[in-house]
């Protein structure tokens, strides 16, 4: 999915507002995903998935850091995310549909925390961006 210059600006601006809360938002999105889509828990059998667990917070920070990296390298995501793509495809073997589910939960989390900034245009741009990240992460599945 091609991001327009306006999409890139919207994504960078929106993610910039996330700032220091990125890890918290990542953890909240994971919790939403686990509650809304319980089958996603199967990839985390060794985690304490209770609200506020250190493991969920830690993984939420990893998710947020990966997205921060993707935002910083929005014009070269395939190269910037290659190691993460390899990890999810070859080692973790995550079902690609889970990236869509997490993306949806991230959008809900961002909208809940930044309702005034979450305009239809920003929503569309973030959705396209997360779809692009998902495409990159699933590119090594072939």
From Swiss-Prot:
* Cited Pfam families: Globin
Q: Is the keyword Metal-binding assigned to this protein?
A: yes
Tissue note: Red blood cells.
Residues annotated as binding heme b = 88
One GO molecular-function entry = haptoglobin binding
UniProt keyword terms in alphabetical order: Heme, Iron, Metal-binding, Oxygen transport, Transport
Which residues take part in binding O2?
59
InterPro entries in the cross-refs: Globin (IPR000971), Globin-like_sf (IPR009050), Globin/Proto (IPR012292), Hemoglobin_a-typ (IPR002338), Hemoglobin_oxygen_transport (IPR050056), Hemoglobin_pi (IPR002339)
UniProt key word Cell division: no
- Any one Gene Ontology cellular component term annotated for this protein: haptoglobin-hemoglobin complex
Which Gene Ontology biological process is one annotated for this entry?
hydrogen peroxide catabolic process
Q: Where does the record place a coiled coil?
A: none
What is the superkingdom listed in this entry's lineage? Eukaryota
Q: How does it assemble?
A: Heterotetramer of two alpha chains and two beta chains.
In which family does this protein belong, per the annotation? Belongs to the globin family.
Q: What is this protein called?
A: Hemoglobin subunit alpha-2
- What organism, scientifically named, is this protein from? Hylobates lar
């Amino acid at each position: 999915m091609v991001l327009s210059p306006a999409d890139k600006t919207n994504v960078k601006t929106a993610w910039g507002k996330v700032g220091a809360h990125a890890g918290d938002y990542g953890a909240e999105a994971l919790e939403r995903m686990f509650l809304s889509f319980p089958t996603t828990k199967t990839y985390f059998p060794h985690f304490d998935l209770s609200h506020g667990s250190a493991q969920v917070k830690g993984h939420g920070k990893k998710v947020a850091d990966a997205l921060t990296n993707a935002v910083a390298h929005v014009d070269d995501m395939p190269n910037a995310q290659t190691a993460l793509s390899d990890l999810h495809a070859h080692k973790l073997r995550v079902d690609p549909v889970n990236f869509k589910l997490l993306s949806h939960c991230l959008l809900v989390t961002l909208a809940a925390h930044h309702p005034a900034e979450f305009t239809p245009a920003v929503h569309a741009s973030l959705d396209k961006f997360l779809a692009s990240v998902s495409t990159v992460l699933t590119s090594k599945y072939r």
